[in-house]
């Protein structure tokens, strides 16, 4: 009798698994999909007690929550989801059984559509958890030796359902995350070399980092438009700027802004004569590119200076006043451009960069108003923060915000898979922190 019931149960819930899989595929367009490792959920209050190291070649250390199921069982989250589900059921009933004015119906329909993905996932999590409870109950009655095969089959099925549940947990948590309204923006990327004794090491490193982002843009099929480029001796780079356009550019590059440090024995330049390890820095600034409607610059607020271009560049250098300097009087921001031969084009580029910097100030002000007292795990997001070290002598890149290490610097500087993996980890860490923020701030009233 037990055997017959178990076979019937397994058949029914194998169908359930297929339904779960179809559901995730069917609703994937409604939710932001970011691959998540369920072992890496951060819980701030445990950050100084539990350390986890991923078991792969390029290991990453971080503080973590033990399991998504523990996060799901958080009383505040359970209460929050129960209330949302009740609200969804009420709205569903109203839309189907109660007459309302056109304006009220439109408002109800909009809210109903917002809650629908959450309600469906919540229901399927409950069904899957109930399925596991039924399976475990049946397994307890299978103690005979001749039913060992059925026990193994049941345990295998339990593991499959548990994996589906974890997938649904991740999908639910993703749907709860606040969406960054600037993620789809294009960006203005600026790089500037630092200063050291024999500063050629910083200038060479700046060129390598700029080339890395140009290669990454090609890897992601983005458009890379050079705005400014000031070369240095020995193939180095003083300063450069570019506009990068494409899908979700700011989302992927927003955590690249900050101080990048290099440790190496220089191969060229004055510093190479000493044959010892030198340390240098360069800075990266990532500015979301605004539309003209987002930032309006009053011509009365600008002071425009023209001067002769410097450096290599052809006959126009040091002969015509083609270079342009814009000073935004209210904020004191200064932007220069001498990339083009035409003064008009240089003015257009400088104005574009100025708008981006003003837009960044608006964004930072907005974030300061929304941000809690606790800093994000991925850092303060300040452009002056040291975020990463490139140690050439040890062939290692370390991101200090998430204690992420990767070997093979040359491959990393190619700006392809290795860099993309690190960027995905940074996005993942930000999402983990956002979930913690959500629980601590929005659900703290629930006991």
Swiss-Prot record:
PTM annotation (N5-methylglutamine): residues: 315
GO MF annotation terms: translation release factor activity, codon specific
One matching Pfam family, short form?
RF-1
Q: Fill in the PTM field for this protein.
A: Methylation of glutamine in the GGQ triplet by HEMK1 is conserved from bacteria to mammals.
Subcellular location per UniProt equals: Mitochondrion
The GO cellular component terms are: mitochondrion
Query: Which keywords annotate this record?
Result: Methylation, Mitochondrion, Protein biosynthesis, Transit peptide
Lineage, top-rank taxon, reads Eukaryota
Q: Where is this region: GGQ domain?
A: 299-363
One GO biological process term is:
mitochondrial translational termination
Locus of motif GGQ? 313-315
Q: Sorted alphabetically, which Gene3D superfamilies does this protein's record hold?
A: 3.30.160.20, 3.30.70.1660, 6.10.140.1950
Outline where the chain's transit peptide begins and ends.
1-63
Provide the domain comment: The GGQ domain interacts with the peptidyltransferase center (PTC) of the large ribosomal subunit to trigger nascent chain hydrolysis.
Family per similarity comment: Belongs to the prokaryotic/mitochondrial release factor family.
Instruction: Summarize the protein's role.
Output: Mitochondrial peptide chain release factor that directs the termination of translation in response to the peptide chain non-canonical stop codons AGG and AGA. Non-canonical termination codons AGG and AGA are found at the end of MT-CO1/COX1 and MT-ND6/ND6 open reading frames, respectively.
Name-wise, this protein is: Peptide chain release factor 1, mitochondrial
Q: Which gene encodes it?
A: MTRF1
